[in-house]
Amino acid sequence: MNFTKTLAMRIISFLAIFISSCTGAFAQNWDWGGPIDPLQAKMKIRHYRLELELLPETQSIQGSNTITFSAEEKLDTLRFQLINEYEISKVLMDGKEVKFTHEKDLLDIIPVDCTCDQVQIFYGGKNPIAQNPPWTGGFTWEKDLLDNHWMGLSSQGEGGKIFMPALDHPSSEPSEGVDLIFTAPKPYFVASNGRLIESQEVGQKMRYHWQTGYPISNYNINFTLGIFHEEKLDFTSVSGEVIPMQVWVLQENRAKVKELLELLKISTETQEKYFGPFPFSEDKIAVVETPYLGMEHQTINAYGNNFQFVPMGKVKYDWLLHHELGHEWWGNKVTVSDWADMWIHEGLTAYGDWLFFWEHGGPEAYFAKVKAESRNVPHAKPVVSPPNSTEEEAYHPEIYTKGALVIHALRGVLGDELFFPAIKAFVMDERFTYLNQVTTRDFTDFIQSYTGKDLKGFFDLYLYTTSIPKLKVSKKGKEGYVISLQGIDFEMPLEIETSEGVQRAPVGKKGIEVKSKTPPVVDPQGWLMLSR
């Protein structure tokens, strides 16, 4: 999600939760991440098979999750997370009921004496209602203009435990993907991750079976219920693969669906140019209209931006559509295991938003965007949070705009001939994608190795501190100027515009001397974050 457009909503969310708690309404904090539970560190999730009946009239769910797992040793306890708002009716292993406890959102299961690698958990109950989706998540039950039910789920800040039992930690993704089977009353449709492999009438209900073989984060497992109009096309990727591209919108918005699909196509082409082929070619490229702003759910991006298309060069641009799509590369393909490194998801995706300006609006639009966004950086926290951070601890403004400005500055330091190949090489490297989750050090070490540049000082400064170098320009003689960067012990290349033209030179605290009949303009394009 985009922070600069949502800071006010975060404040509203806080006030809403505070007021509701004062009036006795239910409010809960379901943060996730941090140090992994020692019991869960012994276990790897291979697959989830989630089978749910969605009950709009009671705003509840009923069903089961079958979890396939592996462990290097025999486990005395299987520990999963599921919020206590749901009631567990039974747990099966090897076809037999087993003992369990369900307290404080933790589900502890005592396995039977077998070589079982599966457990099926039956549960159900009223859905937790989102206080301010997607920032304070949960289920959002609304009605469309025709008085039909319309439900969306958001859980980035809460994890999967608000809708299914799971090993709920960002380091845990099912290595063999998920099967998602939803039953809903006719004529409702349920849009979800992966490909729809079967839809079946069951009396007065519809059953939809979605499937993906890709690993997927718990918060990206998602489903949206409604009566939708669908538009689709076959998208030819730069890889040569033909991928289904699908858009689902409410019936009242069907007149806008073709343009939304065309914008999705343009955004995908733009993302592919800079970051390589769409990462989930076996599934689909898709968005579904949701009763909240949006989220990067894998292969089924949530879209609630009310079709706010703006001109950009010869095309149109929808910031929400493009941003959430960008997460398919940064967040869903390249994924962190510790929320401390969350900026890799948000900063790189935000920079991809700026590249749309570069690609379609040209340099003038790009630099204007960078200048405008740079005003939104408080420099209050380091971009990278302390190790083992929770989602709430790691989610702050710096991971968005400052993260993107770090990447922008990296481009300025390296130059386009090194920068663009390096970024694409990282996102295409199998060592850092899908199940091979990454850290900030993985990224910074790779960039230095790929480019052959020593960037340790640069990365340490901008990612791990709140300090900004002080630009100092001092007059020396009639036409001389000394230019230096105070507060750093390394040099960074600066563009310097003098009466003789533009030169590029490494500058540090010792400074360099330039000759100019007019005061020099340092870093005229604004590549670096400097105190001026």
Locations of regions flagged by a protein language model:
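N-terminal, polar/Ser/Thr-rich
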Residues: F26-Q62, S89, E142-W150, K456-G457
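Zn2+-dependent metallopeptidase catalytic core
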Residues: N65, S70, C114-C116, F122, ...
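Beta-strand-rich binding/interaction modules
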Residues: D76, E87-L92, L455, G477-Q525
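A surface-exposed beta-strand-loop module
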Residues: T77-L78, I83-E142, K205, I512-K515
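Extended, low-hydrophobicity, Ser/Thr/Pro/Gly-biased non-transmembrane segments
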Residues: F122-F228, G526-L528
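Juxtacatalytic substrate-recognition/specificity segment
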Residues: L180, H209, H229-E328, N332-D341, ...
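Acidic/His/Gly-enriched intrinsically disordered linker/tail segments
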Residues: E346-L405, A409, V413, F432-T433
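Amphipathic alpha-helical substructures
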Residues: H396-K476, Y481
